[in-house]
Amino acid sequence: MLDRLQAVENRYEKLNELLSDPAIISDSNKLREYSKEQSDIQETVEVYREYKDVREQLKDAKAMLEDKLDAEMREMVKEEVSELESQDKTLSERLKILLVPKDPNDDKNVIVEVRGAAGGDEAALFAGDLYRMYSRYAEVQGWKTEIIEASYTELGGYKEIIFMINGKGAFAKLKFENGAHRVQRVPETESGGRIHTSTATVAVLPEAEEVEIDIHEKDVRVDTFASSGPGGQSVNTTMSAVRLTHLPTGVVVSCQDEKSQIKNKEKAMKVLRARVYDKFRQEAQAEYDQNRKQAVGTGDRSERIRTYNFPQNRVTDHRIGLTIQKLDQILQGKLDDFINALVMEDQAQKMEAAE
């Protein structure tokens, strides 16, 4: 561990030199890249330096105990040794966590795609519940939510809704929401009072910046069409809706939320860039992890990750076996109990893999 920490400190000092280089300062991409790298490892370096200082003090204090000391002084030194050993242990554990490989996408904004799956109208209504749950969670975090594309049903649900959440650390918190969410409840239209089971799928994609994924104009086919509202009726006689197809990968994105074709194209391009980036990211991750089963969510969107049981006011996350009897509060955006537990499980798994 100490060798890795020393290498991190050496890199931090090298970055300080690079960030003072006029050639780097004049290159905005390099400046941003190195500044972010330095920011990412700064806490690790600061804690490592504190750790080295504590170990040096501990070494000196233990050496003092080898000298001839009066009883009062010996007791004081013993207390100091005990305190320093406690600090040493705390800092050591903290450094282990800081050395856990950080997902480079953690600080990014996210694009969330929620779709009604098995269950027809009830699944579409549940997709709406999930959208509102994430919107309220984002609001509590101080993040901004913006709808990119929505396909409504006549009962007020969503066949599909795609929205962006802008906020630092959004992907770190929401990436574990990938998968199939199951709901068990009595539909309002059910006269017999029978419980129905429906599902909705959630995909969480990190927003890709232009410098990270280069999409050439020649590789994108642009189709325009008239936008439509609930039930398929036309709501705009102009060809304002846009469909983008990334020819090399076959990824397709549509957007008709705005009245302006230009704005719809801008929104669609954000989603296209994120989906293409996510496709490459998933392929690279699958290759890297092909022989190692992850403990927390594989990202497989057909995987049932959570069940929302309305009659029992219960939500269960099947990946970590956590059940909470607060479904009503969770749908109001109080997701911290689940998200924090999933983050901790992920860190523990990565620490184990790193040892």
Swiss-Prot record:
GO terms for cellular component: cytoplasm. PROSITE patterns: RF_PROK_I (PS00745). Methylated by PrmC. Methylation increases the termination efficiency of RF1. It holds the Pfam family PCRF. It is found in: Cytoplasm. The keyword Protein biosynthesis applies. Coiled coil: none annotated. InterPro entries: PCRF, Pep_chain_release_fac_I, Pep_chain_release_fac_I_sf, Prokaryotic/Mito_RF, RF-1. Keywords: Cytoplasm, Methylation, Protein biosynthesis. One of its GO terms (molecular function) is translation release factor activity, codon specific. The modification N5-methylglutamine is found at residue 233. HAMAP family: Rel_fac_1. Belongs to the prokaryotic/mitochondrial release factor family. Peptide chain release factor 1 directs the termination of translation in response to the peptide chain termination codons UAG and UAA. This is Peptide chain release factor 1. The gene is prfA.
